Amino acid sequence: MIPQIYLRKGKEESLLRRHPWIFSGAIDHIKAEEESDFAEGALVEVYTRQGEFMALGHYQVGSIAVRVLTFEREEIDQAWWNLRIAVAYDVRRTLDLTDNPATTCYRLVHGEGDSLPGLVVDIYGPVAVIQCHSAGMYHARMQIAEALRTVYGARLTAIYDKSSQTLPFKAALGAVDGYLWGTSDHASHIVLENGERFCVNWEKGQKTGFFLDQRENRQLVKRYAKGRTVLNTFCYTGGFSVYALSGGAGEVCSVDSSERAVALATENMQLNFGDNAAHSEVAADAVDYLKDIGDKYDLIILDPPAFAKHHKVLGNAMQGYQRLNARALSQIRPGGILFTFSCSQAVTKELFRTTVFSAAAIAGRKVRILHQLTQPADHPINIYHPEGEYLKGLVLYVE
């Protein structure tokens, strides 16, 4: 028997609105034949207090107790996984990503946005990289791999599981990164994004190897870069830097605290422009570097890592965003363009914009909003799960 979770009275309201999370405080009691049936990552049925079926999902110890896979009574077998991956693939085909010679890397599965909470799958040419954020998805990884093989066929040569850093440590699953199927001669692979070339290392790189969620925003940087002197902070692999130089920037400087990241940015510059690119790199803390940059730059990119992964640290995080933006706004040349981002799920669009407004006031600059940015369409947002809109950005014109 599949373990059954019964909700407290009235706690089914979010499920009636098709929200895919059930919080631990909503649970009244649990029925299971054996305690072992109710292990971390187990498939569970969810019922109202009165015994009305509501959903099937993966159980996990923690604040989010159940991640809903379906609101229907259905068997979660190989055919189910094949269908879910096929539906995600069809969405990307609609977006002209699956057979696009100019873009060979994209996100295939984006968790709740594709009704597969706890799962990320990114495609890098012939290699699929899986990251499981829940124990339930980790237990299903071989079924997921089989579904990927079914959907992609011979176009896929390897499937790499990179879940060791994304699984909850309390689950104690002993996950080890490695190939679930196939192999690759090299852990690095050259991919195309809007015609720009990037070397991606899914084994050693951050996330799955590349930040795919900035694809469209990088293209916008390219549009504004012509003739400008560009500073790309928190550069990682230099994605924004490559696009800026491709767009005709006069000079680009890439800054990151990681020497390895700076080396990757340089490698990608050489890959696209050879050894004579008008590019410099600095291994330094970006916040400290911005203390005194003078008026050299007229296009600055601020794309920091998440300052607030939890609401408990939100106050300190917003102070950090304010300080970072104030430093850039106070020193950017008149007529300059600032691209500023937050990837913190806990930071709403309204809060981020208010914080940037206060930074502009501190800097004493007249500022216009030119664009309000978000994640691309291959990182879709489940309309019933607004928390999925994690990336927010502003493009500012600074007088």
Question: Which functions belong to the PLM regions below?
Answer:
Residues 260-301:
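S-adenosyl-L-methionine
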Residues 237-250:
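Conserved SAM-binding loop of SAM-dependent methyltransferases across substrates and taxa
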Residues 1-123:
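Non-catalytic accessory regions of SAM-dependent methyltransferases
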Residues 251-256:
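Conserved SAM-binding motif I beta-strand of class I
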Residues 297-327:
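Mobile active-site "lid"/loop adjacent to the S-adenosyl-L-methionine
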Residues 109-122, 138-210, 219:
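Non-catalytic substrate-recognition/targeting regions of SAM-dependent transferases
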Residues 227-236:
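Conserved class I S-adenosyl-L-methionine
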Residues 337-399:
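C-terminal catalytic and target-recognition region of SAM-dependent MTase-like enzymes
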